[in-house]
Structure formats: C-alpha cells, structure tokens
Design a protein with these regions (language model features):
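Flexible, glycine/charged-enriched surface loops at secondary-structure junctions
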Residues: 36-41, 202-210, 234-246, 342-354, ...
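N-terminal glycine-rich phosphate/adenylate-binding segment common to multiple enzyme folds
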Residues: 47-164, 271-275
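N-terminal alpha-helical transmembrane segments of multi-pass membrane transport
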Residues: 2-8, 18, 22, 28-53, ...
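N-terminal small/polar loop signature for handling phosphorylated ligands or for N-terminal nucleophile
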Residues: 46-60, 223-264
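Glycine-rich phosphate/nucleotide-binding loop
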Residues: 257-359, 363-367
Length: 406
C-alpha cells in the first residue's frame, strides 16, 4: 500500500510519562506505516521545558499559529512534589494554559461513546460537548498570600496614569489570601462566536450559564456580550436551522444538562469548563474517552486528549509490567489534526485515513477488547478481554488495514 502524501506539516507537541510512550507507539504502529507523516516536532516533556526555561512551549504555540494545526500529547503541570521529583528550578506554568492564552481560543470537549459502555446519566442519548473559554479567569489570576492585618484594594489606572476606580476588597484583621482575575471583551466576544459557529456546524443548541445575579459586573459582562453576539450575528441562522440559544444561572444549567438527552454545546467560562468537562467525561464513561480541540478566532486548531499523563501506568511500565492504557483519545487527537490538515489542503486521502483510524479504534472496543479503565465500569460479561498496549494496538492496526482496503 502506497503511503498517503502529506506535503504540509502540522505542529507535533510531545509530552510526558505513559502518554509519551503511547504517543510513539500510535505513531509507529497506526500512522507512519500508512502516512508519509510530516510534522514540526516540539518536545514539551517536563525535563525539556526545564532545559529551555519553558521557551519550547512558546515556540510550539507560535508553530501552531503559523501552521494552523497542532496535535499535543498530555503533559505534566508541576506541583511541589513534581518539582522535587524532577529537580526543577521553578514550578513551570501549565503548557495548556500558555498555549490557550497565546491562541486565545475556545476548547471543545466531547465524549467518545461506545454502545457497550452505558453513561452514568442514563437519559443522555447524544454527546454533551463542553465549550470552554480558554482565556483568563483563575488561570491568569494574580494572587497574594496576606501575612497579617491590612487592606486589600482593587485599583484601576488608565493609560494616562489617572486613577479611575479604587475599591476595598477586604480589611484583613489577620492572615488570609486575595486574588484578582480579569478578562477582555474581545476574548469573550470571540468565545461567543466560536461557540455559535461550532454549534451551527454540528447542529446543536448552545446553553450558557454564569452567576450574573452575584457577579454583577464580571459574569454580567459574559451574559450581555453572549446575548449581543447571538442577537446581532447568529439568531437568524439558528432559527433557520431550528436551533436555540439558552442562558440561565450556572447551577440551573448544570441541573438541566443532567436531565437532558444531550446533543448540546454547553458553553462554560474557563474554570467551569475545566471542572465540567471532567464531570461529563466521567458521566459518559471514562476520561480517556474524551476528545479535545482548541479553536482560535483566526482559524488555528490544536487537538489533544483530554486526560493526564497516566502516571500510575508509567511507573508500572517502567518496572517492566505490561499495562492496558486507553489510546482512543490520543488516537482521536491525531485523527482530528490529520483530518483538519487534509480538509485545509484538499487532501481527500488524508481525510479518509483519519476517519478509518477513528473507526478502527471504535470497532476493536465495540468487539469487546477493553482497556483497564473501561473494565472497571462494566460487568465482565460486557467485554471479552483486557489486552495490553502492544496487543491492543496490533488489533487496531489489523482492523485499520482492512478498512483502508475496503
């Protein structure tokens, strides 16, 4: 079989631990035998981020901007324990947060559904897609650990140096902590447009929730800008497509999502989306069964698996044990990036390969070959075996070869 040509590269962002191992296995077993893979490689492993003082992360973000498409492996965001383990000079920032801030995009996360795995929320018949604003809020916050009594103030000075606002946050009588968050109208507007455009492309309603009754400036701004974009730019198209936009308080939206049939785009502020995407993944099946794509306003796409580095499997694998790690989300990340490259370049063969890659993985799982994470969710009668990584990828490759020759 002649390899599929890929003249234009994508940015490849490698990562850490077990997902790094699986990353290489997927490339070598499922992609390189069939595609003349063309990537610009960036090593975002924690040791290399330490070596480059995290410059490699900024370089990777610029590559995604330039090439329009990137695919990213899961990476470690270090805490104090990881700093000691890896001998880090400092606690480097989350690569995801850095890249999201650089691209100023929206993260869309949707579960990969299997007929054999029933969702915890039994009324869900279709996927719930989380649209997470990927800028600002907690992830760009400024914090201060208050040592003792004193006053914390929120001050705004305009570009000419004139003080426009000074508000007391709190008069501390003892130690405490203070935090200041921000966002930009331009980023919120692009977030809204990304959500409505994506929803139109997949034919789903948009639900958005915030807490404007309490946050009468911050959350109210989100609410008003969403409504403005919808009314002025998308309402006619939504009505023509038979779709709807719904706003409610975040707690009300959360309750309504759990009672819905699914098939909605749930727009969330940054922190809300971080939490709710994992909740939706767990309720749908398993976190390794969650796709993720970051879409920027200027048409850049970054695909990744919406899970961590699977540290426990890595430690076991390093001891020589055979492990059973779910590869589907990582496979879907590669497939998504290759498909988008093919769509942008008019490369029909690459688009077809991407669909076959996804289908091959689904077919093997639907045949009852489950990974460790899924066996814990099902009755033993629901699956036939629990193959290790090498065996599972071999089964998927055989199925992929069949699909490509049909």
């Amino acid at each position: 079989m002649e390899k599929i040509k890929m003249p234009v590269p994508i940015a490849e962002l490698d990562g850490d631990e077990m997902t790094h191992v699986l990353w290489g296995m997927i490339k070598d077993t499922l992609i390189k035998p069939f595609v003349d893979l063309n990537t610009e490689y960036y090593d975002l492993s924690l040791p290399h981020r330490e070596e480059t003082a995290d410059a490699v992360t900024a370089q990777a973000a610029e590559a995604i901007k330039r090439l329009k498409i990137g695919v990213k492996c899961a990476t470690i965001t270090p805490n104090l324990q990881r700093q000691e383990e890896y001998g880090l000079s400092q606690l480097w920032k989350s690569p995801n947060a850095t890249i999201r801030a650089a691209l100023d995009g929206t993260v869309f996360r949707a579960p990969i559904l299997l007929k054999r795995v029933k969702p915890v929320v039994t009324c869900w018949e279709k996927p719930v897609t989380i649209a997470r604003h990927a800028y600002g809020d907690l992830y760009k916050a400024v914090e201060y650990r208050v040592p003792g009594a004193g006053k914390a103030e929120l001050v705004f000075t305009d570009e000419s140096g004139r003080e426009l606002s000074r508000q007391t946050v709190f008069d501390f009588k003892g130690p405490g902590v203070v935090q200041a968050m921000h966002n930009r109208d331009a980023s919120i507007l692009s977030f809204a447009r990304c959500c409505f455009t994506y929803a139109l492309s997949v034919g789903q309603d948009v639900w958005f929730g915030a807490k404007d009754t309490i946050s009468k400036d911050y959350d109210q701004t989100f609410k008003l800008l969403f409504q403005k974009v919808y009314a002025e730019e998308y309402k006619a198209a939504f009505e023509q497509a038979g779709l709807h936009y719904r706003y409610a308080l975040i707690d009300d939206i959360a309750a309504k999502v759990l009672r819905s049939k699914g098939g909605i785009v749930w727009a969330c502020k940054n922190y809300d989306g971080d939490v709710m995407s994992d909740l939706v993944a767990a309720a749908s099946g398993s976190l390794p069964m969650m796709t993720s794509v970051l879409v920027s306003p200027d048409g850049c796409f970054e695909y990744e698996a919406a899970h961590g580095t699977v540290t426990d499997h890595f430690y076991r694998w390093r001891k020589g044990e055979k492990v059973s790690t779910n590869p589907l989300a990582t496979m879907f990340a590669w497939a998504g990036a290759l498909r988008k490259r093919g769509e942008l370049d008019g490369n029909a063969d690459l688009v077809r390969f991407s669909g076959c890659l996804e289908q091959a993985g689904l077919d093997i799982f639907e045949a009852g070959h489950f990974t460790e994470d899924l066996t814990m969710l099902c009755d033993p009668s629901e699956y036939t075996d629990k193959p290790d990584n090498d065996t599972l990828l071999g089964l998927i490759r055989a199925r992929l070869e069949t699909l490509l020759t049909e």
